[in-house]
């Protein structure tokens, strides 16, 4: 009648329903049942009984739960009549691009708005170098970004595969800007690279699709 869950490294989420609880590695499987979640930090322990939830540290110290509300539409995580998710995402690309730009570019194309980075624009302007990190197709997106940033912003750019970046000793300066790209916001190697960049005092910006994901919470700003 008791379930114990602990986090170390990989993400862990507790869904809070009415006299019921859910455990998952991210929020998407939970949203069908509840939009109230608790994100555990490393070394947090969740002790779950039928109608009771306790959060503790490894030292058995109690933790006050911080319940967050998910801003996810269940329709976004269903296949929508397609045979599989990859096919759905391929055919959704035109509408996805339009939705990405909607509300961010003025009607006359004279200005661009990114609310998630407004407070750090002075640091971005003062940056001497940009480091883009990601895995898989996120890394490929970073390679495209490299051409655009260097052509239009005239800013030196390095694109790094997160799983390689985290295991060497990269030279990172405080005036560097690190952009972490991840569709899920939970890519383990990218998360580790983010933490390495923050240890070296670099400003980290996250680009991901999932609000409330680990990357969206651990970066300094996000898009």
Where are these regions (language model features)?
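N-terminal segments that mediate ammonia production and transfer
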Residues: 1-124, 138, 147-152, 165-171
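Glycine-rich phosphate-binding loops that contact phosphosugars or nucleotide phosphates
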Residues: 125-223
């Amino acid at each position: 009648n008791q379930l114990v869950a602990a986090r170390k490294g990989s993400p862990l989420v507790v869904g809070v329903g009415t006299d019921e609880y859910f455990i998952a590695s991210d929020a998407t499987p939970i949203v069908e049942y509840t939009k109230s979640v608790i994100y555990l930090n490393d070394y947090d322990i969740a002790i779950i009984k039928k109608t009771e939830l306790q959060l503790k540290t490894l030292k058995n110290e109690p933790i006050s739960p911080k319940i967050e509300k998910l801003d996810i539409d269940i329709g976004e995580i269903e296949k929508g009549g397609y045979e599989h998710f990859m096919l759905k995402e391929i055919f959704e690309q035109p509408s996805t691009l339009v939705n990405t730009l909607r509300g961010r570019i003025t009607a006359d194309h004279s200005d661009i708005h990114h609310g998630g980075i407004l407070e750090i624009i002075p640091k971005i302007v003062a940056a001497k170098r940009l480091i883009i990190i990601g895995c898989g197709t996120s890394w490929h997106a970073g390679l495209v970004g490299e051409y655009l940033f260097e052509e239009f912003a005239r800013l030196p750019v390095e694109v790094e595969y997160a799983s390689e970046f985290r295991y060497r000793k990269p030279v990172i300066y405080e005036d560097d800007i690190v952009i972490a790209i991840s569709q899920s916001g939970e890519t383990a190697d990218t998360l580790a690279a983010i933490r390495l960049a923050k240890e070296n005092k670099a400003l980290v910006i996250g680009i991901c699709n999932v609000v409330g994901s680990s990357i969206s919470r651990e970066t300094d700003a996000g898009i």
